[in-house]
Amino acid sequence: MSDREEHEPTHRLSRRTVLRLGLLAASAAPMLAGRAHAQDKPGAHLIGKLEGPELVTDPAKLPKSFKEAPELAELVKAGKLPPVEQRIGQDPLVIKPLRDIGKYGGTWRRGFTGPFDTSNGHRAAQNDKLLYFDHTGTKIVPNIARGWEVSPDGRVTTIFLRRGMRWSDGQPFTADDFVFWFEEVYQNKELVPTPLPVMTINGKPIAVRKVDAATVQFVAPDPYFALPTVLASVWGIGHHARYGRDALGGFAPAHYLKQFHPKWSSKDEVTRKAAEMKFDSWVALFKNRNDACRNPDLPVVTPWKTISPINTPTWILERNPYSVWVDSAGHQLPYIDRIRMTLAENLELLNLRAIAGEYDSQARHIDISKLPVLLENQKKGGYRVYLDPSTQGADVGLFCNQSFDRDPEIAKWLGTREFRIALSHGIHRQQVNETFVLGLGQTGSAAPGERTLYFPGPEYKTLHCAYDVKKANAMLDQLGLTKKDSEGYRLRTDGGGRLRLALTTYLGFLPFTQVAEMIVQQWKQIGIRGEVQEMERGLATARLRANEHQIYFETQWGADNMFGHSPFFFPIDGGTPVGPLYGVWYASAGAQGKQPPPRMREVMEKYRKAFGVPDAERTRLAKEVWKIALDEMWVIPVVSNSPASQGVRVIKTNMGNIPERLWNSAVSDNPHIAHTETWYFKS
């Protein structure tokens, strides 16, 4: 459900490249640590002020008349479209652009890597979340929903839709589209065999019901105060364009999808239709027809809609004529006519095109190791480079599998807190930071950014993360790992020879394999033998879910808001690398998987409880979760809060309303956190 599903390879930095960027790294790294005085140093302009456009909610400031793109005005004139006032409805979403009222026109050029790179479009162009976060990531605001209300007991969340809002084909967008999704899609076991965790509270299902055409309610059996956060995030509901392909999303265009559903014809009829269209089942057909990236005919409520699908060499999205977004001067948004994404067969080609100035705005798949060359070519390429440090905590982390059980000796050590802390003290983080992230990361704990909602406190920023070989060796000795072989490596206590730790890596946004190889060399000083096992992403995931990995290299996706994304630093499902069997136990309420030890159960209980309590109590519990997790060090951090993952932003200088810095997180869906429908071409 997030970008962790769709990664591309990065590349090793040469020594020459590192040296060329020495000055930049030296100046930029302190800024990431929050030192304001670094702004007068060379390279400081690369990390600017966190900023974004504002929603206009004051009735006195709402526009009284409306305008539209010239091409849409021509269609209205020809009688092929209703007037703009009828298309945007009675409650348009009004945005005050960051800097300017923009101009219509132009094609935004981007790169993508193939049919699995769906998040590329979701993040840039397909925002249809009911609720959203503001540009700081700390405040929930309306989006395609006009507003929301949580009952005093937390059991009913009421969503107020925008009256008169329409799907991209002109049909009304109403509460019926929510009821259709809930009753005929979500509750159909062929389409959705397993309940979505966030559609339950304390293991009990929640329901969706219609109040009137513009009002829908999510009704829970127990208090569910966190539901607005869930709807604003990337959990699988409240966001049709991203999750329709999985029959999730929270709403769907009933008037279009009924033709592919057996209830409105017959099982035989939709099965026949599926066979004609070369799908192996009606379920596969239904999900394909509900895929906003693959089906140009699908009605959507996004700013742009697909007209040439993602499974072609050029993925094209065009302005939605029924877009509900409007600027503060009354211009229907988006300003930009269309988005054209060109297939890049590999990451190297995509980055070369960025360097050559062939993209108008691109951060996804931009390799941080290319930063020196990007900077050298800014003027020639007609672009500017911005850096957006993440707030997710560990960009590179060693996720220690707490439920590993294939080797009792290894399982014992992975499950021993002092052993994990000793491994941490044996990592020279600054060496990794300078070599692979150009010195732009933080070398402390896996804690999220200081300005995030659930930052546990300054005392946790560096907990157990000092590079201290002497301390690491002493801790390992105290654990009884005192015997060594002729090469100085520690021996297993069961007589099985050298103690070896398997480090699983895959090709991703960051050079996990190269980082792992460096750590293997560093661990020689503490007598620990690490063995890197690089594999294809799909195989790595399969081994993870089978509980076969020991230590898994990964990014701590979305950890800056554990209620907006699977937290990843403790297990809540079978895809969490710190303990998949424990995650299955949590997700199944103990019916499956393996019961975790007390400390992890304590974290799980606090997390489960937090969904059902008001904001202040939820914040307190979340900070407690972080404190325990950081002290236990189930994730051994290496480099944190850097711009390495989707944080090197290449923007053409003729694009307007571009923020100096974006909130960069799996929860934020950057760049759309900056409301890309307000971006425009100055010339």
Q: Could you say what each language-model-derived stretch is?
A:
Residues 1-17, 21-31:
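N-terminal secretory signal peptides
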Residues 40, 181, 185-195, 208-209, ...:
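Extracellular/periplasmic solute-recognition and catalytic clefts
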Residues 162, 167, 291-295, 322-373, ...:
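Ligand-site clamp/hinge motif
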